[in-house]
Design a protein with these regions (language model features):
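PP2C/PPM-type serine/threonine phosphatase catalytic domain
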Residues: 1-248
Length: 248
């Protein structure tokens, strides 16, 4: 199996700095784009992830960077052959560890107090694919031309219903003073089929474009830069980051 991956992350039209970041294998992407093709064998592992630092917290750009770099190291250092349940347990242990680390950093350096970030990821480990989510960044699957959101937003809007195009308070994150962080993890191996496309994105995309618009762009073979540019043209009220993973 081969993965064709394209990622991009930009500040948008309103924010002063980009607090988003994308991780493709061992490469972090911010204010840039990056493409890679990865051949997977049974013994390989691969991680793509996206983090959206808390815009209302000092150090959001540090939070997203710290979490992705720490996860990249942790994932690469995991022992081979863990069962699905042991893999899930290891990720939960990592979540608790990184939360403690960010809390300690916030106490020792006041400028980072309550910094936090979302996280969404697609991982290949021990011949299985897993997606994971904490916050309101999203993972979608495009199958036979139809786009479906796999993750559930951990947000107030999702809890109470309704929508607001520009504001969506999250109810779960890594750091950010959240004492009860949790992470959704799903074994999605049976959903990973040749021709499918997986999309990781921050809310800077989904607040500017609806699912129908995103579906149309993906069916037109748009890359990560194209999706980011469309969000910026629509107003670019937030940082916008996209990672597209095509199953070849």
């Amino acid at each position: 199996m081969r993965l064709s991956i394209h990622a991009a992350s930009y500040v948008g039209c309103v924010r002063e700095k980009n607090e988003d970041m994308v991780l493709v294998s061992h490469t972090c992407v911010r204010e840039d784009s990056f493409a890679d093709t990865i051949e997977l064998s049974d013994r390989d592992r691969c991680l793509t992830a996206l983090a959206d630092g808390m815009g209302g917290h000092l150090g959001g750009e540090v939070a997203s960077s710290d979490v992705l770099r720490n996860l990249d190291y942790f994932f690469g250092d995991m022992p081979r052959g863990l069962s699905a349940s042991d893999y899930n347990e290891a990720i939960v242990e990592w979540l608790n560890s990184i939360n403690n680390m960010m809390d300690s950093k916030g106490h020792s350096e006041p400028c980072y107090h309550n910094m936090g970030t979302t996280l969404v990821a697609l991982a290949y480990y021990n011949s299985r694919f897993y997606w994971m989510n904490c916050g309101d960044s999203r993972i979608y699957r495009l199958h036979d031309g139809s786009l479906r959101q796999l993750s559930t937003d951990h947000s107030l809007t999702n809890l109470v219903g309704g929508s607001n195009k520009h504001t969506n308070y999250i109810t779960n994150c890594i750091g950010g003073g959240c004492k009860t962080s949790y992470i959704d993890m799903v074994d999605c191996t049976e959903q990973v089929l040749p021709g499918d496309v997986f999309l990781l994105c921050s809310d800077g995309l989904t607040c500017m474009l609806n699912d129908e618009e995103i579906e149309q762009l993906l069916n037109e073979n748009a890359d990560a830069n194209d999706l980011c540019q469309k969000a910026i043209e629509a107003g670019g009220y937030d940082n916008v980051s996209v990672c597209i993973i095509k199953i070849v």
